Regions:
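Common nucleic-acid-contacting/processivity interface regions adjacent to the catalytic cores
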Residues: 20-21, 278-403, 407-410, 416, ...
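Proline-aspartate-enriched helix->loop->beta-strand connector
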Residues: 162-186
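Glycine- and acidic
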Residues: 143-149, 168-172, 281-287, 318, ...
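Active-site palm subdomain of RNA-directed nucleic acid polymerases
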Residues: 270, 555-583
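Catalytic palm subdomain of template-directed nucleic-acid polymerases
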Residues: 586-620
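DnaQ-like (DEDDh/DEDDy) 3′-5′ exonuclease domain used for proofreading
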Residues: 1-170, 294, 298-317, 321, ...
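C-terminal, non-catalytic extensions of nucleic-acid polymerases
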Residues: 614-868
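Active-site-proximal helix-loop-helix substrate-binding element of RNase H-like nuclease domains
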Residues: 128-130, 138-141, 146-149, 153, ...
Length: 868
């Protein structure tokens, strides 16, 4: 099975394939792609039913002219194989360099400062190595606790020793954190500066460094300007764990710094230090080495727990694509479907943007998303949810959606118009004129009666958007989704058998990875339909709208039916029991139903109450699925099986809903199993740009509310916290931020008679703070000793009280700042204003949601509280 692939473009369209196989090693061969031309006697059929024959001559009228060559080769060479290779040489890497300004792409390309250390871990040998620059020759190389520390007296020596080891290890996969943006490009360009291209290209086993764009084209760095796209070390797969993490863990993290992620997920953070990193390097090399190695150790522990590398390999081999394609669902799903069709002997169509290049200009056209019901903000108890199982894949399969089954659509009024189901058509006057269009965008009018007749006679399915699909043949996307569903079920059963019957955890984990790969693929197909350049979409987002608007209609109809059922049962009228809904789920408060069905139940008996709530959830799940079974057939004219099903997932003891996708949930039962979980998302109290102290307190405050603390206790927590602010270090309460623009907001710089710059009227607070810091640094003649704040750097800022300079705010780095400036900030920092401007309105927002009166936090009020 393949481990790496690189295709080298030669002269006159000649191509050389470099393919590394786990059994045969490196294979090198010339390659010419195969296209397919129309031929009434051709031995192959296309997806749209035409006869074709193979040819190696390019023509814009041929089929399969725009398939990436890497995908072509991998499908041809490994058509019947989906498994990952038996082995890989995986190396984890982290580099450190002297501080030399903001890490912009241009600065990385210029690579102005020395690389001071390189830490790596070879997974095959479990060997950790750190190459450390020691120009003072104060240390010798040594081994300790299984780690090799290699002292290098010049940067050249460090880089050459690293390259020697790199070539010895022969990595097939290199892993870092944000290494796509920084480590690998900086390493290459620094080698280019210190040595030459011949030395720098040793990073690639093929001696080729390419700049791989995110759309698959490759050019050498000599002919293409460095952009934010990553450098391609030809012959080595570069998997940036930062990007993998953001792909697989879709919930927003407060911070994506490696140390913060490490602490949260594997209880392993960065090595702490009190000075700047440059100063640490000069004054404490042992700690600096530990700092460098720790970054690699965090990566190792993250992958041990999350196993994203193994998951990536499983997905990419299922799809027959290079590993770097893992971030783009269109490439993955295109590869998977091409493989499926090739196994059937079917030739694929070209991309819509190849057939009609003008579609590239409409790539940003909008389409409707999922329906989110606005909650009435508040704290709710005894809440259940009902979730659609794989809603979007189920819509695609149930309505047989696909580019080859789409026959046309109703011309809708706007992207939210979801009232074109068969039931909607039947509610119109039969003579009412409706505008419809075919896949070629040709428009005509038809009466509602004639359209209904056409739908029913031809057994067409109709989406909520008015998209029309034939049902006499299955779309290839539906076939692939069905195949993936079946395989996922098969692997899940094999996983359970391995764990429970065979007692083989290794085999169980193997099957678990396989089923997880299929789960991910099932859930990301629908998004590809919105990409005009995806091979299996219509190019005009007709299918995308059909999917999302049908999803909207289903969740809305389900909400109406759920409210009708509860109101009917307990005798209320028009009461909304559905608190909120997301794209595929709804949260329902059932406390009134519990009290109605069991008026004598002791609600303080938690286990008894949960049992009754589970009974209610099971009952309503059966009722609403029975309703859906008939209703979806009437709505969408589904003749055969459909795949729509609502399932109860969780029970919340309490749920705080502040707005769309902004909530805290105290989960006490998950899929019928008792649990104790807090799920918090999107709340203002926990924003990533909050001071860490405030963010931590906000999280604790929400937890206490969810665990049932009363208002008086919450009041006391807030009052006590505000009082404690006075004794906190400034870095704890300062607001962390980035600075994007500095020069743009300076009207006039300082003069001999004026210390501070004149700023433009709309200068943001963080920019003002940075400029004032720089001006004060220069005024105190400290700018030769300490760096000024530059654009794109991370800083902190605070508000100031009345001070001799009449500044209202000031920024600082938070590490290794001049004592003179820190002394000034500590003397004049306005901690109360910092608290009020950053945090107070967020706290008041929570109280407003909970219908609580906000406590007075002044000193007079504090005497009524006992604060330890």
């Amino acid at each position: 099975m393949y481990q790496a692939i690189y295709i080298q473009q030669g002269e006159n369209y000649a191509k050389t394939v470099h393919l590394k196989d786990d059994n045969e090693g490196w294979l090198h061969f010339d390659y010419k792609p195969t296209y397919y031309k129309l031929n009434p006697n051709g031995e192959f059929k296309t997806l749209d039913g035409k006869c074709v024959s193979p040819t190696d001559r390019y023509s814009k009228d041929n089929y399969e002219i725009d398939i990436p060559n890497e995908t072509r080769v991998l499908i041809e060479q490994y058509l019947e194989e989906d498994e990952p290779p038996k082995w890989h040489n995986i190396v984890f890497l982290d580099i450190e360099c002297e501080i030399g300004g903001a890490l912009t792409p241009e600065n990385i390309k210029n690579s102005p400062t020395k690389i001071t250390s390189i830490a790596l871990y070879d997974k095959s040998t479990q060997q950790t190595i750190c190459y450390i620059l020691d120009e003072s020759k104060s240390m010798e190389s040594f081994e300790e606790n299984g780690k090799s520390i290699i002292a290098c007296y010049t940067e050249k020596e460090l880089l050459l020793k690293f390259l020697d080891k790199w070539e010895e290890l022969e990595p097939t996969i290199v892993v870092g954190w944000n290494s796509e943006f920084f480590d690998i490009p900086y390493l290459y360009f620094r080698m280019l500066k210190v040595f030459d291209h011949n030395t720098a290209k040793r990073l690639s086993p093929l001696g080729i460094i390419g700049n791989l764009s995110k759309y698959g084209s490759v050019a050498t760095v000599e002919t293409q300007k460095l952009t934010k796209d990553y450098l391609d070390l030809a012959g080595i797969n570069h998997l940036d764990y930062f990007n993998l993490f953001k792909k697989y863990i879709t919930k927003q993290e407060p911070s994506y710094k490696l140390g913060d992620i490490g602490e949260k997920y594997v209880n392993l953070g960065k090595i702490k230090y009190e000075v700047s990193l440059d100063k640490l390097f000069k004054e404490d090399k042992a700690k600096f080495i530990d700092y460098n190695i720790r970054d690699v150790e965090i990566l190792i522990e993250l992958d041990k727990k999350l196993q994203f590398i193994e998951l990536t390999l499983n997905i990419c081999h299922l799809c027959h694509v290079p590993y770097e394609n893992i971030y783009w669902s269109t490439m993955l799903n295109e590869g998977a479907i091409l493989t499926y069709l090739k196994r059937q002997g079917i030739v694929s169509n070209n991309k819509p943007t190849t057939i009609n290049p003008e579609l590239r200009l409409t790539i940003g056209d909008e389409y409707a998303g999922g329906y989110l019901k606005d909650p009435i903000p508040g704290l709710y108890s005894d809440v259940i949810d009902l979730d659609f199982t794989s809603l979007y894949p189920s819509i695609i399969r149930s309505l047989n959606m696909g580019v080859e089954t789409l026959i046309g659509n109703v011309k809708i009024r706007d992207k939210y118009d979801s009232n074109w189901t068969l039931l909607d058509l039947k509610a119109l006057r039969p003579s009412e004129k409706i505008t419809i269009e075919n896949p070629k965008r040709q428009v005509t009018q038809i009466t509602a009666g004639k359209l209904i007749e056409m739908i029913e006679k031809n057994k067409l399915t109709i989406a909520a958007s008015g998209g029309l699909f034939r049902s006499d043949k299955r779309s290839v996307v539906c076939d692939v989704l069905s195949d993936w569903f079946d395989k996922r079920v098969e692997y899940k059963n094999m996983m359970k058998d391995a764990y429970k019957v065979k007692k083989d955890p290794v085999l169980g984990e193997f099957y678990n990875k396989r089923q997880h790969a299929f789960k991910i693929k099932l859930n990301d197909v629908y998004g590809c339909f919105a990409q005009n350049g995806w091979r299996y979409t219509d190019g005009y987002k007709v299918i995308s709208n059909a999917i999302t608007l049908t999803g909207q209609r289903l969740i809305k109809e389900s909400i109406l039916e759920m409210n009708r059922m509860i109101n009917t049962e307990i005798g209320t009228e028009d009461v909304d029991y559905v608190i909120t809904s997301d794209t595929d789920s709804m949260f329902i408060r059932v406390g009134d139903v519990v009290r109605y069905r069991w008026p004598d139940l002791d609600v303080s008996d938690r286990d008894a109450r949960i049992a009754k709530i589970l009974e209610i959830a099971s009952d309503y799940q059966k009722q609403i699925n029975k309703y859906l079974n008939k209703h979806v057939r009437d709505l969408f004219n589904i003749q055969d099986d459909h795949y729509f099903e609502l399932k109860q997932e969780v029970i919340l003891e309490r749920g705080y809903f502040a707005g769309k996708r902004r909530y805290a949930q105290y989960i006490i039962n998950k899929e019928g199993v008792t649990t104790e979980e807090l799920d918090i998302k999107g709340l203002d109290l926990m924003k990533s740009n909050f001071p860490p102290l405030f963010r931590k307190f906000g999280e604790n405050l929400i937890q206490q509310i969810m665990f049932g603390k009363q208002k008086k206790e919450i009041d006391l927590l807030i009052s006590s916290f505000k009082k404690s602010i006075a004794g906190r270090e400034i870095v704890e309460i300062a607001k962390p931020t980035g600075v994007k623009k500095i020069r743009e907001y300076i009207e006039r710089g300082p003069t001999a008679s004026k210390i501070f710059s004149d700023l433009k009227s709309k200068a943001p607070i963080n920019t003002k703070a940075a400029i004032y810091y720089n001006d004060l640094l220069r005024f105190k003649k400290l700018d030769k000793k300490y760096p000024t704040i530059k654009e794109f750097e991370k800083i902190y800022y605070v508000y100031l009280k009345d001070n001799p300079y009449r500044l209202d705010c000031i920024g600082f780095y938070g590490v290794d700042d001049p004592p003179e400036i820190i002394e000034f900030i500590e003397k004049y920092v306005d901690k109360e204003k910092t608290f009020d401007s950053t945090f107070l309105n967020k706290l008041q927002g929570v109280y407003d949601d909970l219908k609580w009166s906000f406590p007075s936090l002044n000193e007079y009020a504090n005497k009524f509280f006992v604060i330890s």
